[in-house]
C-alpha cells in the first residue's frame, strides 16, 4: 500500500491523473469510478485533458435506491454533470436505483462487472471506513448487493439534500470482493474527519468492522490524502 501526501484536493487530482495516464499507456480499458467530493478534482483533470476516452468503459461503485437517473441527487446525474457529458466513454455502467426489483438489478450488475474487469478503481472513504456503500460488518467476499445505509452515512450525505429525511436509506453497491478484484486502486481521503478511518485502513487490523482495511489484502493500492487525513498515522 502506497501513501502519497498532497497539499489539497487539486494536487491530489493531478497526482491521480498521472497514475491514470500510466495505466492507460499500459493498456487499461475499464475504469471503476466513484462519486462524492473526493474525486472531483481528478475528474476535472480528465475533462480538461486531451485524452480520448471514447474507447474506454466505466463502471460505477454504487447508486441510491429510489432516485431516478434524472434526479440531481442521483449518482448517475452526478457522473453526467461532472464527467460523462464533457468526456464521453464508449460505455458507462451504473447500478439502476430501482426500488421494485433490486434483486434483479444486483444480478445484472454483477454480470456487468464479470464482463468488464476493472483495471483502475477509484475510491473515497467514509468516516466509518466504508468504501462504496459497504458499511461496517460487510463480508469481504461480498459482491454487488442491496445496502441498508448506516445512520452516520445518511448524516454525512445529508448536506447534498434539502433535509435529512430526503436522503435515501438504501443503495445498490459493488461488494468488497468486486472492489478488490480491480487490478489497481486509488483511494482519496481529505480532511480530519477521515483520519481515524485512514489510520485503520493503513496500519490497523484487517477487520470487517472497517471495510477499507480490506485494502491491505490488495497488491496495488495508492492512497492520496492530505495532512489532516494522515494526521493519525
UniProtKB/Swiss-Prot annotation:
Which of the seven top EC classes does this enzyme belong to?
A: hydrolase
Q: What protein is this chain from? A: Glucosamine-6-phosphate deaminase
GO-annotated cellular components: cytoplasm
Task: Enumerate the Gene Ontology biological process terms.
Answer: carbohydrate metabolic process; glucosamine catabolic process; N-acetylglucosamine catabolic process; N-acetylneuraminate catabolic process
Q: Which gene encodes it?
A: nagB
GO terms assigned for molecular function: glucosamine-6-phosphate deaminase activity; identical protein binding
Q: Where is the active site?
A: 62 (proton acceptor), 128 (for ring-opening step), 130 (proton acceptor), 135 (for ring-opening step)
Q: Does the keyword Hydrolase apply?
A: yes
Q: Which family does it belong to?
A: Belongs to the glucosamine/galactosamine-6-phosphate isomerase family. NagB subfamily.
Signal sequence segment: none
Family matches, as HAMAP family: GlcN6P_deamin
One Pfam entry for this protein is Glucosamine_iso
* EC annotation from Swiss-Prot or TrEMBL: 3.5.99.6
The pathway where this protein functions is: Amino-sugar metabolism; N-acetylneuraminate degradation; D-fructose 6-phosphate from N-acetylneuraminate: step 5/5
Keywords, alphabetical: Carbohydrate metabolism, Hydrolase
Q: Does the keyword Cell inner membrane apply?
A: no
Q: Which reaction does it catalyse?
A: alpha-D-glucosamine 6-phosphate + H2O = beta-D-fructose 6-phosphate + NH4(+)
Q: What does this protein do?
A: Catalyzes the reversible isomerization-deamination of glucosamine 6-phosphate (GlcN6P) to form fructose 6-phosphate (Fru6P) and ammonium ion.
